[in-house]
Design a protein with these regions (language model features):
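Tandem repeat scaffolds
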Residues: 2-209
Length: 209
């Protein structure tokens, strides 16, 4: 249903250049193709489907995405700093080392994504879902979560420094080797299972019998 009424685009760079020169938004597009070191910064994307795309070191800095979807696309090492995502979906997306620093996510879902080494530092996530995705070695330093839903996702060596995790249910997720402050105050009020609690206790030199 999302695909209905979308215009196929195989040259996003040309569409972006036109939109930037005219101060227009990019709306109702179905984007495909490969793009390297392209500058899409500051653009507004409304109801745009990025399907089977490959972006290499591209800049989406300061972009706004409304009801957009990244499906089976590779956005590794791209810059989405200070971007805004509202009602968006990342499904089967690969974002290794991608920078989302200072971005805002509202009612956005990550499903079956590979986001290892991605930087979500200082980002804000409101009513977002992180489903069956890998955030190993990713950074959520000084981030903010409001009413998140986490399911079967991986957080191995993930950085949550100065990010309150109170009320977040990690029971179906994998937690190992987290980066926290010395007091681990970030974990206060977080919901974890018994096995996870034992693993977390090891981080502080505790021996659980």
């Amino acid at each position: 249903q999302f695909r209905r009424g979308l215009r196929p685009v195989r040259n996003l760079a040309a569409e972006a250049a036109r939109a930037q020169s005219e101060g227009d938004e990019l709306c109702c597009l179905r984007v495909s193709g490969s793009y390297a070191e392209a500058d899409f910064s500051g653009l507004d994307f409304d109801r745009v489907l990025f399907e089977n795309c490959r972006f290499t070191k591209c800049s989406f800095n300061g972009c706004s995405f409304h009801t957009a979807a990244f499906a089976d696309s590779d956005i590794s090492n791209c810059d989405f700093g200070e971007a805004r995502f509202i009602g968006c979906v990342f499904h089967g997306a690969k974002g290794v080392g991608t920078a989302f620093t200072g971005s805002r996510f509202e009612k956005t879902r990550f499903g079956s994504c590979g986001m290892s080494y991605a930087n979500f530092g200082r980002c804000r996530m409101v009513k977002c879902r992180l489903d069956a995705s890998d955030f190993s070695d990713a950074s959520f330093s000084e981030a903010e979560f409001r009413e998140p839903a986490l399911r079967e996702s991986v957080f191995v060596r993930t950085d949550f420094f100065r990010t309150p995790l109170r009320g977040i249910d990690f029971t179906t997720c994998r937690l190992e080797g987290l980066t926290l402050s010395e007091t681990a105050s970030e974990l206060r009020g977080a919901v974890v299972g018994a096995g996870q609690a034992i693993e977390l206790a090891k981080m502080f030199g505790l021996i659980v019998r």
